[in-house]
């Protein structure tokens, strides 16, 4: 029953991690297309007066953020999506067949969960911090009358499609951090499963030793009686 509970919990969390990974990857891919491969994470710029008489301002990008940042978080989202899908199918198969991982495979699963947990945390942090820097830059640290969300409805004249950037990264961050919570739960379950399997193995070894001791005493007594009769 305990094994079935572990497998059922893992199956549900893997499915949720797959779902949230999908939620993160789709808007990130759309943003990459809208910005023509340019990355708005960590992008900095300033507002300048384009027309002094009319007082019209235009946002000038001083330096676009590193493309590797956007590529990394998209890659992590895809990896999380694929791994969770494979693991969900594998766990569901074990649940239906009544199989269970060995102690060694449970330990490998724990290491994999820890690795993915760390990588998704890094991706979520990059997404949150990088997008915060972009919003601070485009709103001049809150000095602009419009918020970062409102500015997506304004044509920033950057040669890119910026009509959905806030919604895209808000959804992507939600997907990444939700996926991280799922992997956190999976890591805890993987640790508990390793501990459970280790305790079971110790119990099995203890039972084997007790059986050997119980079988060994009668054999020793029979050998003693046989030797005594032979001497007589």
Curated annotation (Swiss-Prot):
- Where on the tree of life does the source sit, at the highest rank? Eukaryota
What kind of membrane protein is this, topologically?
A: Multi-pass membrane protein
List all annotated glycosylation positions: 51, 162
Q: What is its main location?
A: membrane
The record's subcellular location field reads: Membrane
Membrane-spanning segments: 6-26, 75-95, 114-134, 169-189
**InterPro entries membership:** TMEM179
Instruction: Tell me where the signal peptide lies.
Output: none
UniProt entry keywords in alphabetical sequence: Glycoprotein, Membrane, Transmembrane, Transmembrane helix
Q: Which GO terms describe its cellular component?
A: membrane
Which family is annotated? Belongs to the TMEM179 family.
Q: What is the recorded name of this protein?
A: Transmembrane protein 179
Q: Which organism is it from?
A: Danio rerio (Zebrafish)
Phylogenetic classification of the source organism:
Eukaryota, Metazoa, Chordata, Craniata, Vertebrata
The record's gene field reads tmem179
């Amino acid at each position: 029953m305990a094994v079935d509970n572990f497998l059922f919990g893992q199956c549900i969390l893997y499915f949720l991690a797959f779902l949230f990974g999908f939620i993160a990857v789709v808007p990130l891919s759309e943003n990459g297309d809208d910005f023509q491969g340019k990355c708005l994470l960590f992008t900095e710029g300033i507002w300048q007066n384009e027309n002094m008489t009319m007082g019209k301002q235009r946002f000038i990008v001083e330096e676009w953020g590193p493309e590797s940042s956007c590529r990394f978080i998209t890659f992590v989202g895809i990896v999380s999506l694929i791994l969770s899908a494979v693991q969900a199918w594998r766990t569901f198969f074990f649940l239906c067949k009544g199989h269970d991982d060995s102690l060694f495979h449970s330990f490998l699963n724990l290491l994999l969960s820890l690795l993915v947990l760390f990588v998704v945390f890094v991706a979520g942090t990059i997404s949150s911090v990088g997008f915060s820097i972009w919003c601070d830059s485009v709103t001049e640290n809150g000095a602009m009358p419009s918020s970062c969300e409102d500015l997506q409805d304004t044509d920033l004249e950057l040669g890119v499609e910026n009509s959905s950037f806030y919604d895209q990264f808000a959804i992507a961050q939600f997907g990444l951090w939700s996926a991280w919570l799922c992997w956190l739960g999976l890591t805890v379950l993987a640790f508990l499963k390793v501990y459970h399997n280790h305790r079971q193995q110790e119990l099995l070894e203890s039972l084997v030793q007790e059986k050997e001791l119980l079988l060994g005493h009668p054999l020793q007594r029979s050998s003693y009686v046989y030797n005594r009769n032979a001497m007589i």
